[in-house]
Amino acid sequence: MSSIGLDVSRADGPAKIRGAAQYAGDVGLPGMLYVKALRSTYPHAKILRVDASKAEKLPGVVAVLTRDDLKGKNAYFGPVVKDQPVLAIERVRYVGEVIAAVAAEARDIAEEALDLIEVEYEPLPAVYDLLEAMKPEAPVLHEERIKAQSFPAKSGFRLQDAGNVLSRYHVDHGDVAVGFSES
């Protein structure tokens, strides 16, 4: 039996239409905390200072995570190389990179705590074009490259030692002209 061309009823359709559908944001559990992230407004900048002391003192704030909490820990992740920090440590590399995270008893408390975190930046040169970013003289975004041990096919990647290009992977299999003639 084929359902192509037939109307399909959605089991959740009526609840969505009535506004009765439950979403993750609608769920409240005992002891649940709300987490909000403070994000960079700079495309590329050195982080000179992060002061979360006022946010930590706000009633209802349970925890504030900043770069200071990551010292001495494995703070990087990534599928091929671990080059993505859990949150910004020395600098930010894009608008929206997480600088700090706040866990609080209520959403509005977490949002208020974000406003109390002070961050001082030193803007750095930024590149807004893919081809410009690939040039050798472009600012390098990921200077540290810790090779990941968990990527199953990483042996096929030729990791680059410098620059913004992580890997070059050359595919050369078969005869293109023959492939087109046989298609």
Residue locations for each model-derived region?
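Flexible, low-hydrophobicity surface segments
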Residues: 1-176, 183
